[in-house]
Amino acid sequence: MATVRQSDGVAANGLAVAAAANGKSNGHGVAAAVNGKSNGHGVDADANGKSNGHGVAADANGKSNGHAEATANGHGEATANGKTNGHRESNGHAEAADANGESNEHAEDSAANGESNGHAAAAAEEEEAVEWNFAGAKDGVLAATGANMSIRAIRYKISASVQEKGPRPVLPLAHGDPSVFPAFRTAVEAEDAVAAAVRTGQFNCYPAGVGLPAARSAVAEHLSQGVPYMLSADDVFLTAGGTQAIEVIIPVLAQTAGANILLPRPGYPNYEARAAFNRLEVRHFDLIPDKGWEIDIDSLESIADKNTTAMVIINPNNPCGSVYSYDHLSKVAEVAKRLGILVIADEVYGKLVLGSAPFIPMGVFGHITPVLSIGSLSKSWIVPGWRLGWVAVYDPRKILQETKISTSITNYLNVSTDPATFIQAALPQILENTKEDFFKAIIGLLKESSEICYKQIKENKYITCPHKPEGSMFVMVKLNLHLLEEIDDDIDFCCKLAKEESVILCPGSVLGMANWVRITFACVPSSLQDGLGRIKSFCQRNKKRNSSDDC
């Protein structure tokens, strides 16, 4: 708990703390009295110890002349020995002059001896503790969430290792945003649809919490392709990207006391982070590298219990690049039914299939167990900054209506943010008019890059890729640390690689697999070849002395 000290007649009863006659100020617009008391937020005490209100400065004779004015100089400036503090106004958060007429910095008032101690509490001989009724997570779980379960946070940490003004450009192979490369520009039909929606002037308003009806209908029609029944607009909830879809679903499931959720390992860390913030217990099932990163179905029933509410599958898979077969997904649905749980199907990479295995929507099995599918424009249309996604309900038996899950999602969205109205308005035209040639071109680029990635990884004995990527934008790679000198783990590897080679990778630890890394191949082939070449050079420089470079 935080403690505020009180001494020498100095009272601390508000947001800020006043310093005593020895002249220390705590900084946030609060001045010290000579013998006096400060009553809170931005209040200066006069020379005789009187406080004159909110943000009101006293003159040298201890008189107050109004709201944020000192010695009647009209601009809120405090005077002492005939000097002013310029624009440092003594009016709440502003700055006042000290006893010698000199101005201090950053909203701090100096006292009789002119010393400032920032935001610290006043030093005192007598102490009085204040017990505050608020605090962060006592167990440290939430405090660690941002650092340990966030790709963004770990990417910033690793990027900080890059040498400033290095001889070579930084190659970001840590996250899936190829929009920075001109070759991955979105479809012209998508750009035109957004521009047209803006030009109408009709979509500058707030939308409905669950989304514009026309946009929801368009998504429902789009997602009904390939499933044995039609979705309606009521089956679709629009969100601010796939990330918000996760932020909506997890709290809804966490409303049941003692509930837990089954997550894949490796997996996308936002699920675990959101579960931690909502105190939803997480239990992991493994993906098997030697079986194309298939789900370890046999383990599902052993880790689930009566409090298990749902399981997450990611298909096509991030971070592994796998694409699941019809038979495999069917088995998952049957297990989910036996357990009485719903399936959350993260399908944001549904259009990005690179091999011969087709993408099978989990909604095909909605008649077996209820499915909440997460999708977005971000990946397939290469527009992550547009922030438009959805949650689609595949539930022909209306189980999620009966259990109030759909109602809870609606209620959550009614008190949450919305995707931009003009993007929603453009959505029907984007879905209808984007030509198949656009997707073929994007998939062609990704396929070429994935081939390069897999080939060059195979030529580097210090890393291992157990399965060629078949979809999404990523591949998981094992670090053969026993061949490397003074590399402690995957995070150490990534930080040193960034420092020496200006290549940014995602450590596997944040994805649930220590001593692995995730590489994105969603970039132009020449940059990818350069990056993989730098990785090999780094490994060769840091190899153990008795290790050869032969593959």
UniProtKB/Swiss-Prot annotation:
Q: What is this protein called?
A: Nicotianamine aminotransferase B
Tell me which Gene Ontology terms the entry assigns under biological process: biosynthetic process; tyrosine catabolic process
Q: Give a single Pfam family match.
A: Aminotran_1_2
N6-(pyridoxal phosphate)lysine modification sites?
Answer: 379
- Essential cofactor(s): pyridoxal 5'-phosphate
Enumerate the residue ranges of region (Disordered).
24-127
Q: Which Gene3D superfamilies match?
A: Aspartate Aminotransferase, domain 1, Type I PLP-dependent aspartate aminotransferase-like (Major domain)
Give the reactions, separated by semicolons, that this protein catalyses: nicotianamine + 2-oxoglutarate = 3''-deamino-3''-oxonicotianamine + L-glutamate
Q: What induces it?
A: By iron deficiency. Only a trace amount of expression is detected when sufficient iron is present.
GO MF annotations in UniProt: L-tyrosine-2-oxoglutarate transaminase activity; nicotianamine aminotransferase activity; pyridoxal phosphate binding
According to its UniProt entry, what is the function of this protein? Involved in biosynthesis of mugineic acid family phytosiderophores.
- Write the Enzyme Commission number(s) for this entry: 2.6.1.80
InterPro entries per UniProt? Aminotransferase_I/II_large, PyrdxlP-dep_Trfase, PyrdxlP-dep_Trfase_major, PyrdxlP-dep_Trfase_small, TyrNic_aminoTrfase
Q: Which family does it belong to?
A: Belongs to the class-I pyridoxal-phosphate-dependent aminotransferase family.
Q: Which residue stretches does the UniProt record annotate as biased composition, category Basic and acidic residues? A: 86-96
Keyword list (alphabetical) reads: Aminotransferase, Pyridoxal phosphate, Transferase
Which SUPFAM superfamilies does the record match to this protein?
Answer: PLP-dependent transferases
**Does the entry annotate any disulfide bonds, and if so which pairs?**
none
Kindly state the tissue distribution recorded for this protein: Expressed in roots, but not in leaves.
